[in-house]
Amino acid sequence: VRANRCLKGWLDFRGNCYGYFRQELPWRKAEAWCRVVRGGCHLASIHTSEEHRAVAKFISQCRRGEEGDDVWIGLYHWNKSWSWIDGSKMHYSAWDDDDFSKGQYCAALEDSSGFLSWEDDACSERNAFICKCAA
């Protein structure tokens, strides 16, 4: 039996730790919070459908069925393309639709989809957020 390498209340999934935070912050402040809470953390990047499902289930369990806002992830639009704040490559996506609103340049897991689809929100919106770091 190996010890859980993640902070108490965090999800341990395939070598990474995920922490859900209910406080609603604009995207940049949420990213800053992730960096402070534990070294090496960022807003979460999501690279596979398995990782996405695990994160969505974790958020749903944390929320215990409460209605809430979308949840920031570490994806943002810069220089005409989407990038992960942790510098990882984008190989997977789960956009709700491809009709991006003008000026909405940060991505969130959509509450109404059970967090299984992404939508673009104005980065100034205040949302809950999920951080990710290596275990």
Swiss-Prot record:
* Localization annotation: Secreted, Extracellular space, Extracellular matrix
Its principal location?
Answer: secreted
Designated name of the protein: Rheacalcin-1
List keywords of the entry alphabetically: Disulfide bond, Extracellular matrix, Lectin, Secreted
Q: List the disulfide bonds.
A: C6-C17, C34-C131, C106-C123
Pfam families to which the protein is assigned, alphabetical: Lectin_C
In its UniProt record, a GO molecular function of this protein is: carbohydrate binding
Question: What positions does the domain C-type lectin occupy?
Answer: 13-132
One GO cellular component term: extracellular region
Q: Which organism is it from?
A: Rhea americana (Greater rhea)
Keyword Secreted in annotation: yes
